[in-house]
Amino acid sequence: MASIVAYTEIRDATIAPASRFALAEARRIADDLGATVYALLALGPTTPDGIAALAGEVGTAGADRILCCADEALQGPPRDATHGPLLAAVAERLRPTLVLFPEGDAGAELGRAMAARAEAAFLPDSSLEILPANDSEPAQLAVRCEHDDQGEKRVVRLREIERPVVATLRAGAAPPALGEPASEMEMLNYPTPRS
């Protein structure tokens, strides 16, 4: 089964609005494509009650499963030097078809580096759409990029490329609840550097 990973930014102990939108978009396309939505939480030290509260909120935002790493190394703003090893470990384990970052600092800082590390296509400033089925093809996912690295608009059909896609999504309004607060959660250890 295909998987979609949505990096989920937390601010003031709640999901950042752009991350809520990214989760809602992941949920919308996953339902049409039969994919599993993984929310990735990269947190500094957090109490078990705090993690449980966030997990409930992330579940209602649209995640099927939640991957959470709470470690001192992840405290502070998202940076490739601190968050990149976790993203690489998740990508290696899940081999997602699509990785979504919310618009803003996290996507700008982490998205391009993750795409390079995973040999994935990187599409900044994007939106997602489902192209309807026709007589010759089933419905398929497309990522519409408003400004790629060359400043061009382009639409990428995921079936037409043979590698994963990392995209930063333009923010929009997210519905208040799409899933259940009791999503499956797994705690991850912070990856130790390879020697």
Where do the language-model regions lie?
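N-terminal glycine-rich FAD/FM-binding segment characteristic of electron-transfer flavoproteins
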Residues: M1-S195
